[in-house]
Amino acid sequence: IYEGSGWSVVKTGGGEYYVSSSYVKKADSVQNQGASANQDVSQTQKQDSAGGPGGETGSEAVQAASPQQIGLDGSLPYAGFSKINSGKAVLYKSTAQNRKNKTVAVNAGHGTSGGSIVKTQCHPDGSPKVTGGTTASGAAMAVAVSGGMTFADGTAEAKVTLQMAKILKDRLLAEGYDVLMIRDGEDVQLDNIARSVLANRYADCHIALHWDSTSNDKGCFYMSVPSNASYRAMEPVASHWQDHNRLGEALVGGLRDAGNKIFSGGSMEMDLTQTSYSTVPSVDIELG
């Protein structure tokens, strides 16, 4: 096991998996540290089998035999604003006895090769961004999918978000939820608009996973819908922004109750492409 930057790399089943250090119980000595950590990871990892977090073996117990690949239908609302959309999301059906008949879109942030050199419209109505971020306030066009940040040890954010997305997928399937994996591998050719449109059509809510800090554990928070009046009056934001914020508050509340560090008040206002095009409860959650 390697520990640093507020999270750890657990080696198991021939692979390496990134886990928040808060889930790993420290061993009494360096000699037994790796074994102890593998015994004391969170209940999430305990439910996985030897394949490790997000591995195929751990998933098979709760997934349907034939996951369904789903591409973007250009006739869907807002699909015409997408510039990168040749990739496919993957829909997993839960086989748990307590099926909820609800689908959660799990969006592993970043991971679109070439996404940083393509621009898409920030808002459906062409208005400029009202907050800063990857794209500056006042811009009408944004990067289709940014490359994300790099952790202090050189690991790309996209790699870590995918590992966490697979862990979340397995937990949701075990709890009876179907899961639309927006990105199920290292690269998916779906820009942020395409990801939102797919979630709008095939899911009941949309959760995008990200990290925001590099050298320390900043804490968890979600990107809330800006309080700017003109932004909140724009569709589809006007009809859905309260649902977006409620979902974010619920997720941060759950993370807080589980003992995770929360940054500031748990939210930060941000004008995102994701929520600008979302018609289901949708949130970008930063996990540290």
Question: Where do the protein language model's features map onto the residues?
Answer:
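SH3/SH3-like beta-barrel superfamily modules
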Residues: 1-23
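Catalytic-site microenvironment of enzymes
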Residues: 24, 28-288
